[in-house]
């Protein structure tokens, strides 16, 4: 069948052949030169860039012609389809060889050690942005070392493209030099810089790409989104006033597009159910089908698979497989019924009248011996070995017990008809009618109907019991939107794990503080006022290559905060100010994972809290700043987190003994008085005492201690008493203000311990005071630095102005630098190690060596670790028992929140944590 995208013809040749100079001077240089300080009559950076692009396109149409595709291959290098196999380090080494740069020279060191410690230690000694920009640095070195010529040669766009096409075929360094050296010797230095940028396949237009497409033709970006083909996008029409029909803008088989994505759960189950049950008006035929299927107040519940999101395209006997990130895996899974790891089994998988179809699903690796779906990382090797197996008679591949298994959950196109605008229940009905499942090779993903929060709870328990990834809940009427749209009618739900904080948050970079290792400040956008509020700072987990990528993508966009602060209508910082700030529209997205939320951040960040022990998982180039977590979403996440902290942190849901009870009073009466240290003092103890390591001394334990040393315990304050009154607390409570208004000081529990330790009643000093209206009376008891004359205090007490989080920042940045204290790597985390063989004992020792806690109860730990050396069948049976018990005893409240559960991880999780000196995502080390 012929489709619109198959029938696009190149426009007539241009009147004039465009030069490379035209692109660099009229587009690249001008866009790169846009600064907030030089906007002129334009209100924003984006507005000025839009004007530059419009002017360039008008100039091109008027003076050059309608065939912009050859030029677009240079304007959009990352979309040109050319791969040069030249990364930054390889390019730097190529330049050394090309210009015979001596080993001891400054230029040699700059290029040879581009990604090594030389750059990290030296990069801020001169203009930082220049030394981090390889194209700029390389062009500067080339300008000094290339032969001097009387007149530079002007290259045309076809000439540059021809050279780059040759380069894409050349794998030998000398051949690459022969192609590139004439260009480097004869282009102007600014052109050399942009050519290097193109060689590295880096985006030039960045956030203005969509605008460029739509300026060329109003349907431009939509066409690009349905095919991701630069040539077809820029050649489908020479008349921007001639719009395409909706049928032409529909998806086409064998043309790649980004699939629809799901949102994460941000509300209670009860609210979510109401949202998923929401009904929209439909045409009579669909309404009739809706009622026939009994879908009133129902929603779909599907298992979230641990695989590779994949779109299967079938057109006649031809197949295409495209991943979520548009990578073509057809060579692996098959392009025909004859060959391929999957397609060779699909000859009878479709109904006889199916000519063309697009299916959305998840590609997983299935182990037929163990009858389990394997972790995501095993998928590619399984597919490769399955593909090779069909071409060999050698039985070396017979040991491979896994192969690709495609689970389909949606149909988007059928026999020339785009189905994305049809309701999901209609699409699923079609899907079940046209497919003939091949067991454990090609099946429709099981879908069940739910109608209440109890249905979600049951499904979550099953997920926990089977150690699966989670659920996806879908509105039965939901439509499908391509291009990576996150549909609010598709919600992913995952079990909550026994980490203090297990969310991966996509955050916008808004600031930077240069150091040996850059740290990037991220912010949250408020949907109410559009302002970005500073939230956290991250440096861990970013590889040198990623640091370089961030610097490339944001080059020239940074503004020094000591020169110009951002307007408060755009960005709000707390007391922690980065060295540079960047406009969010010029920035990028980082995926950040943290161990906990630190609510003690105070005014350091504008949000009022921050992420503790965070690290960057990756740069999210596939996400725009508008797809990140908002301030309001984070507020909800934080509320759930704090609520979880207030609950028992185990799946057992044990009830704590009430603080005040008749039984407690009777126990207190039985305490024997052994000293008169506190005689004449009445104690009202209002809070527990919590140590930095998490150890808690309860109110009842302190009461017993006070009574043991002769103190009197009271439950309220009587101002007429003859006793001295001591109100003990280290928490702000609703009644605190009442006592302060009566002139009563609030004293920390540590005072009780210090008195007992020294055997005398100590005077009250600032160190012991939690809150008071009489601070002046205490300040004279310490020296000018706040240090007591009689009591030794640690540094964080001598400098009480610094919060714990600020002290932690100072320790990390000053005391340790890059040599972080590995000994505290697992501090605050508990592990249950399966087995008791030699391997398990060694593993336990390693965990304890890095300050991890070993738990005797698997339900109460953060991570259940399976050592490498074990009997797999025995271990699987044991783990299945654990999973079932965790599922049974998991507590789910009425709001859909649940007690947290442990991760099942392999020994590699512990080893990787120690190697990287931070806690990686346990999903990457899941045990199956």
Curated annotation (Swiss-Prot):
* Identification of the protein by name: DNA ligase 4
PROSITE patterns (UniProt xref): BRCT, DNA_LIGASE_A1, DNA_LIGASE_A2, DNA_LIGASE_A3
Recorded catalytic activity of this chain's protein:
ATP + (deoxyribonucleotide)n-3'-hydroxyl + 5'-phospho-(deoxyribonucleotide)m = (deoxyribonucleotide)n+m + AMP + diphosphate
Top-level division of the source organism's lineage: Eukaryota
Looking at the record, the residues that make up the BRCT domain are 673-769, 821-927
Which CDD domains does the record associate with it? Adenylation_DNA_ligase_IV, BRCT_DNA_ligase_IV_rpt1, OBF_DNA_ligase_IV
Question: What is the source species?
Answer: Candida albicans (strain SC5314 / ATCC MYA-2876)
In this chain, Mg(2+) 1 is annotated as bound at 362
Q: Which chain positions lie within coiled-coil regions? A: none
* Residues the record lists as binding Mg(2+) 2: 469
Instruction: State the family named in the UniProt similarity comment for this chain.
Output: Belongs to the ATP-dependent DNA ligase family.
